[in-house]
Amino acid sequence: SPVCTPSGQPCQPNTQPCCNNAEEEQTINCNGNTVYRCA
């Protein structure tokens, strides 16, 4: 299953969205990689 970067944790490259509610997903850029963090 996909693993997201939990809120408040450092960026992790190449993670996938995993929040149940898309509105809780925040797309951020970390060193040129698109990563996902749960709001």
Swiss-Prot record:
GO function term, MF aspect, one: toxin activity
Coiled-coil region: none
Organ and tissue specificity: Expressed by the venom gland.
Swiss-Prot/TrEMBL site (Critical for insecticidal activity) positions: P10, N29, R37
Location in or out of the cell: Secreted
Any Gene Ontology biological process: defense response
Name of one Pfam family that matches: Omega-toxin
Superkingdom, taxonomy of origin: Eukaryota
Keywords: Calcium channel impairing toxin, Disulfide bond, Ion channel impairing toxin, Knottin, Neurotoxin, Secreted, Toxin, Voltage-gated calcium channel impairing toxin
GO cellular component annotations of the record: extracellular region
Post-translational modification: Contains 3 disulfide bonds.
Paired cysteines (S-S): C4-C19, C11-C30, C18-C38
Protein family according to the UniProt entry: Belongs to the neurotoxin 08 (Shiva) family. 02 (omega/kappa toxin) subfamily.
Function description: Potent inhibitor of insect, but not mammalian, voltage-gated calcium channels (Cav).
UniProt domain comment: The presence of a 'disulfide through disulfide knot' structurally defines this protein as a knottin.
Record's protein name: Omega-actinopoditoxin-Mb1a
Organism, as annotated: Missulena bradleyi
